[in-house]
C-alpha cells in the first residue's frame, strides 16, 4: 500500500508554530494548490490543503516562510478525529509533511525582510560560480557524439530496434 503526497503551492497564512508539552516543535500551515484545469469562466480554481510538520523542519518553515511563499510539500495523508468544545466529534484530514522545500528565496517574496537582497545576491553569485565551473568541465570533455564528417559504421545487429 502506498500513501504519498507531493504538492506545490503557496502558503495561505503564516505557519503556526507551537510546542508540545515535551518540547517538540509542530507547525500547522495551509497551502493553496492550483487545479490543472480552468472553470467555465476561464479561471483556475485552487484547493486549500491543511498540512502539519514536526520538529526542526517545523521551526525552519515558521522562521523562513510567510504567507504567499511558494513551497513544495512531500508527505502523506492522515485522518484523525477529536472531540470539539461542543462535545461533537470533529474529523480532520491533513497532509503530514516529511519535508517542505522552499521554492523561493526571501528576496523574491516582495522584500519582507531587509536581508533578503543580500541572500539573493549571495545565491546568485553561488549560481554563477557553479555555472562557470560546469562550463569549464564541459570544455575539458570532448563530445562523444560530435560528427567529424565521417560516416558512422554500425551494423544492424548492434541496433536495439
Swiss-Prot record:
One annotated GO biological process: DNA replication
SUPFAM superfamilies tied to this protein: Nucleic acid-binding proteins
Domain SSB: start-end pairs: 1-104
Sequence motif: Important for interaction with partner proteins, positions: 156-161
Pfam families assigned to the protein according to its UniProt record, in alphabetical order: SSB
Transcription regulation as a keyword of this entry, yes or no, is: no
Region annotation (Disordered) ranges: 106-161
Source organism superkingdom: Bacteria
PROSITE patterns the record matches = SSB
Q: Name one GO cellular component term.
A: nucleoid
**Bias kind Low complexity: ranges:** 115-139
UniProt-listed CDD domains: SSB_OBF
Task: Name the InterPro entries on file.
Answer: NA-bd_OB-fold, Primosome_PriB/ssb, ssDNA-bd
Please provide, alphabetically and separated by semicolons, the GO molecular function terms listed in this UniProt record.
Answer: single-stranded DNA binding
Report keywords, A-Z.
Answer: DNA damage, DNA recombination, DNA repair, DNA replication, DNA-binding
Q: How does it assemble?
A: Homotetramer.
| Function recorded in the entry | Plays an important role in DNA replication, recombination and repair. Binds to ssDNA and to an array of partner proteins to recruit them to their sites of action during DNA metabolism.
HAMAP family attached to this UniProt entry: SSB (MF_00984)
Question: What is the protein name for this chain?
Answer: Single-stranded DNA-binding protein
Q: Which gene encodes it?
A: ssb
